């Protein structure tokens, strides 16, 4: 099972943690997106959108990290713990996954990605969207140890990757006590946390280098 990735990518780190939780071995194929490896014809043939992460399992190619995570659990999970089969429980996990993609991570991208290109962050309005995203997450976690039920699911793992990316960029999680409590626990119970954090540190290093270069 070939896994095309960059350790810096939040989505890539999500899949790595899910695979570790399942005990699934990935054949890691590093792509250097800064060198445009993702645009090479052999990769575009696998994924016309030329995005990472991309998984190729016995000739079946799938991309988008949350889709990959669910696929791995559905195919290789010994049970449905990480992605419940019960329709209501599954719907809640899916809602949190979509929240991560469309709200939480989106707010990160809009505020912090400009640092990579211009050396300056997004607008004050963009930062307010981050704050509102965390306010929502804080509400979701009221009285809860996990984001979608009473145990670890793929939703926790995806959101853990995103929240750790915010932390490495010095976003203050302590303003959101439920999130901070959840995060402290999630780091302890999620397989592959150390690898996730290492990738987040690497991502911050790339941004810092670009920001310094932009100031020269």
From Swiss-Prot:
Instruction: Tell me which residues make up the GST C-terminal domain.
Output: 86-207
Domain annotation GST N-terminal: ranges: 1-80
Sorted UniProt keywords? Detoxification, Transferase
Highest taxon of the lineage: Eukaryota
Name the reaction it catalyses: RX + glutathione = an S-substituted glutathione + a halide anion + H(+)
Provide one Gene Ontology cellular component. cytoplasm
Q: Which GO terms describe its molecular function?
A: glutathione transferase activity
- BP GO terms, sorted: glutathione metabolic process; response to toxic substance
Q: List the Pfam families.
A: GST_C (PF00043), GST_N (PF02798)
| Gene3D superfamilies reported in the protein's UniProt record | 1.20.1050.10, Glutaredoxin
Q: Which residues bind glutathione?
A: 50-52, 64-66
Q: What is its EC number?
A: 2.5.1.18
Q: How does it assemble?
A: Homodimer.
Q: What does this protein do?
A: Conjugation of reduced glutathione to a wide number of exogenous and endogenous hydrophobic electrophiles. May be involved in detoxification.
Q: To which protein family does this belong? A: Belongs to the GST superfamily. Delta family.
- The molecule here is called Glutathione S-transferase D5
Underlying gene:
GstD5
